[in-house]
């Protein structure tokens, strides 16, 4: 019994140290934003206990208040890979004014000059199936039918009932599990 209690105490001590480190990282990343930081700590705590897989959320606010800094310098630095102590890879996709879903999900490989989309590009570049992907300027996506296509692709990416089978048009028929 004492060995079991010692094991529980060691695990709790490790979690407590991690949460204190996460608090410091978030405070160093950006001043203020107490509500957002509290919510991020709650989400990270869920990841740490192993009961939460991928998670999608959004930051809202006027330009220049620190949304990108909170994600890049805060969240990405808080999430550490247990294998090599590296931080979670971070990728940035600005989509303001975009009017073509192929930017995200690729072009069919039969077209001359076709290529895979930005999502697959990030996975290959970061050599990771669960990087933090920050999609900026969602409110500025074209309101045309092509803009609706972009919103549909993004919905597929964040919907936990669908994102375990994302397909880039370039790699037609190959499911990518983005649920982690």
Predicted regions and their residues:
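Conserved catalytic/switch belt of AAA+ P-loop NTPases
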Residues: 135-175
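Interdomain "pre-motor" coupling segment immediately N-terminal to P-loop NTPase/helicase cores
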Residues: 1-18
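Conserved AAA+ P-loop NTPase core
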Residues: 93-121, 147-159
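Pre-Walker A (Motif I) flank of P-loop NTPase domains
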Residues: 52-57, 129-131, 179-180
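Pre-Walker A (pre-P-loop) alpha-helix and adjacent loop at the N terminus of AAA/AAA+ ATPase modules
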Residues: 15-60, 119-120
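Active-site phosphate-binding and catalytic loops of NTP-dependent enzymes
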Residues: 47-53, 89, 115-117, 162-172
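Walker A/P-loop
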Residues: 53-94, 124-125
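Conserved alpha-helical scaffold flanking the Walker A/P-loop in AAA+ ATPase domains
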Residues: 110-133, 167-175
């Amino acid at each position: 019994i004492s060995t079991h209690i010692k094991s529980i105490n060691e695990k709790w001590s490790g979690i407590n140290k991690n949460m204190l480190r996460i608090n410091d990282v978030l405070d160093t990343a950006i001043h203020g934003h107490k509500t957002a930081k509290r919510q991020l700590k709650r989400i990270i705590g869920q990841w740490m206990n192993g009961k939460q897989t991928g998670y999608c959320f959004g930051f809202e606010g006027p330009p220049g208040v620190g949304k990108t800094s909170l994600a890049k310098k805060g969240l990405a630095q808080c999430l550490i890979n247990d294998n090599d102590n590296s931080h979670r890879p971070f990728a940035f996709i600005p989509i303001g004014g975009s009017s073509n879903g192929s930017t995200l999900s690729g072009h069919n490989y039969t077209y001359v000059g076709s290529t895979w989309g930005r999502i697959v590009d990030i996975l290959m570049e970061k050599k990771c199936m669960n990087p933090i992907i920050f999609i900026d300027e969602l409110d500025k996506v074209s309101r045309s039918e092509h803009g609706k296509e972009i919103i549909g692709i993004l919905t597929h990416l964040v919907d936990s009932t669908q994102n375990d089978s994302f397909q880039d048009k370039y790699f037609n028929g190959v499911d990518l599990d983005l649920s982690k």
